[in-house]
Amino acid sequence: MKKFLSLVLSVLMLMSAFSVAAWALDEELVITVVNDLHYNLTYTKKATKANSINADFAHIGNASRLPHEAIAIIKGFLSEAAENESQAVIIPGDITDGGKKNEVKGIVELFSKFEAETGKQIYAVPGNHDYYNLKVTPEKFKNDYFEFGYDEAIEIDDDTASYVVDLSDEYRLIAIDSCVPGEGRHGIDSSRLEWIKAQGEKAKADGKKLIGMHHQNLLEHMIFSGVIQPGGVVTAKDKSAAEVYAKAGIKYVFTGHTHDHDIASYTAADGTVIYDAVTGSLNGCYAPYRVVTFGDSVKFETRGVQKIDTSLLPEGISANAVALAESNFPEYTKIATDLSYRLVFNQYTTAKGLKGVLKLEDEEMNAIIDKVGNRLNEALNMPLYKENETEEGKSIEAIVEKYQTFLPETEYKDMIDLAVTIYQAHNIGDESFPAYSDEVIILTRGLAAVLSYALAEVSAEEYATVLNFIVDLLGVDIPVNFTSYTGSAVKRFEGAEILVTTVALPLVADFTTDPAPGDCNVTLPGYAELVEEEPSFFEKIIAFFRMLLDTVRTMFAFVPSWNK
């Protein structure tokens, strides 16, 4: 009997081992993703006054990121990446701010030290900023950053700085140089797509799962991103590149460039879903990076640099700001980038700023912009509420009340304050301002008021020209004749309101409410599938007893009475 029990126990152990072997998931791969580091030695010199809005943060300019703090942030990130659970770090471009020789030397030293101390490999590709130094060619980039991917590459493209490297026994990284040296636009052309196709075929032949990375976005992550940053999105007008990625087996691609923190998806013609995960700039709000785990599913976790060595900050930053950076660095980044975006909005909503962005050849429109641009900026900076007016009637609330509507009560100071909040929410990820929120209500009514104020002194013909221009710029078609709304101030407000509600609101809604999937902490489908569908618990029990019975029959196979 003891022998029988021992045999049964052995069978159970063998069965357990068989079960684990048969149903084990793929070994996990964990990577850290960080981009748009913008390493720059220029800002290590004494910080000077760049704004008169916030005395404590007077060094903050309109860069929309934190260049003075960049080196301290990068070192803080490397310290955290050294301790986290990832096996490698991938960097989809803009490693430096301008590709200068001293910048490259400085960041290479930091990366080399990180690899030597941690044993973790860094894999990098260029961004447009890395090519801003026209002396930097793909060949030079490959030489400068040789130990960060190229040294382990199983294949390197001759014409670009693209390469392929195995991250593990199961996963292969296709690191794509998506840039055109000296320009901001992407360079994913037919020849690069052919190279991607070829790598996809090789990966399939080798049984590898392809993970992609490059600098410019593959998919659109915000409304009008293809208009706002021409050439910054590979598939802004043509989705054929996404089809190539899907067929090549690149289910996930990591990008940068736009400084958004967002995940977008695309369903190919054959039903394959691919994901483009763009990570916010490391020098942006909350200094974000991702830790991504590849297994049966793909788990995204957003983290941010929690602490920096404030002794690395340049002179000229106020003591109060340094103290905040020391005690609560995430809050420091939020205050500083909010201020920077306010400066950006103010810069581009003047006559000069609008003409610089739009670059119009239409003399009539340029003349109208000269007339209305500064009034537009004035309206955006007006107090939102009457209680804060410095001049009677000069508030957004006073304007909308003239047209029998109202604003919800909030803590926002003006329209730019609101715009910064909404824009920052998009940059941070998982933004959620539905159409019924106070923010969207104020945004739509406030924009109508701003347009009415800005266009109050133009002719009827100029008024209709501006509204039709906005409609054309946004690429929409609405059956509205704006010449019917050019008469009284009331009619002009109605025209502006129609423009906002029928054209802008649907587009704003797409920007203020994040579509699935989530952006920050989310679990998405993996590459790996079980060799066969895992049986149910009941099926496992039946299989166990069948195996047990077969074993017992085998044990007594030579007993005469069992063979009769």
Residue ranges of model-derived segments:
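Non-catalytic terminal accessory segments
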Residues: 2, 25-27, 314-564
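Sec-dependent N-terminal signal peptides of Gram-positive bacterial secreted proteins and lipoproteins
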Residues: 4-22
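N-terminal active-site segment of His-dependent metallophosphoesterases
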Residues: 24-101
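Active-site-proximal beta-strand elements of phosphoester/diester hydrolases
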Residues: 28-41, 170-181, 213, 274-281, ...
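Active-site neighborhood of phospho(di)ester-bond hydrolases with catalytic His/Asp-centered motifs
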Residues: 33-35, 89-93, 121-128, 211-215, ...
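Solvent-exposed loop/turn segments at secondary-structure junctions
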Residues: 37-40, 95-98, 128-132, 179-183, ...
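His/acidic metal-ligating clusters that form di-metal
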Residues: 82-85, 172-174, 183-273, 378, ...
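Extended active-site neighborhood of metal-dependent phosphoesterases/phosphodiesterases
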Residues: 101, 105-201, 269-275, 291, ...
